[in-house]
């Protein structure tokens, strides 16, 4: 049976609507009928066919890894799922036999493959994943929100890596993940949450999500903002989401002694770092990859159930046949999350 899917067909800019064979299920898998997908920054990299994509993405391949759908098939060894369950899923498929997997640190598996990155993705009418990777969506959480659980998980993992209660938090990079991380920090009890960027549309989005200050570093100095807020000692926690060298070095300059930094943004390989700031301030820097399985997923659902409102981050919806308009919107930088509807 042929199904519709968005694929990377050629090693050049673009993504194409194609027909592919319906995926087949193994004993430990589930088959998901896709309802909604969201476009990730990674999908934009793949669309643009940048240096990272050229090294990473096999062609041709169905792409996409942010989704919600309904279980329509269950492998014979699978327990705990029923036909009709609403699910999203962890996009990192892990090996199960390395030291970290066997030690319960699955997100650090050295043999990880990625849905829509180096194995068949979710921009399709149907997706097969190991049942281990599926996450049931609690009642009361909308399909729209469930479809962005993957990037929301990046935000939660980054934000909750350090204690935030009563702390002053600096977030560099107001993309969707940075904005969601800011909302999480506020929700769990941080004092001042300051986010920086140069994109005024996204800074406005961050203001809607409740940050203390959204700072356009083209027109405003971070030091002046800290002074306005009565901060005399620097930020306690930094969340670096941009991969921008000047943003990271500005973060180092403005951290308090003993401050802690989570790094999610991917910098250029030749980024210069003022290590004196790190050493003499006694800073702790932690690299963040993916989501903790499945602690981050439980936290994500619980945060929404306890009143965290992420709805402003979803700014655009398109029918799947209008996928090109969705990608154009994401590439423009004038959007939050963009959702493609498959039904």
Swiss-Prot record:
The keyword Oxidoreductase applies. It holds the Pfam family ADH_N. Keywords: Cytoplasm, Metal-binding, NAD, Oxidoreductase, Zinc. Zn(2+) 1 binds at residues 40, 65-66. GO terms for cellular component: cytoplasm. Zn(2+) 2 binds at residues 95, 98, 101, 109. Binds 2 Zn(2+) ions per subunit. It is found in: Cytoplasm. Pathway: Amino-acid degradation; L-threonine degradation via oxydo-reductase pathway; glycine from L-threonine: step 1/2. HAMAP family: Thr_dehydrog (MF_00627). This is L-threonine 3-dehydrogenase. The gene is tdh.
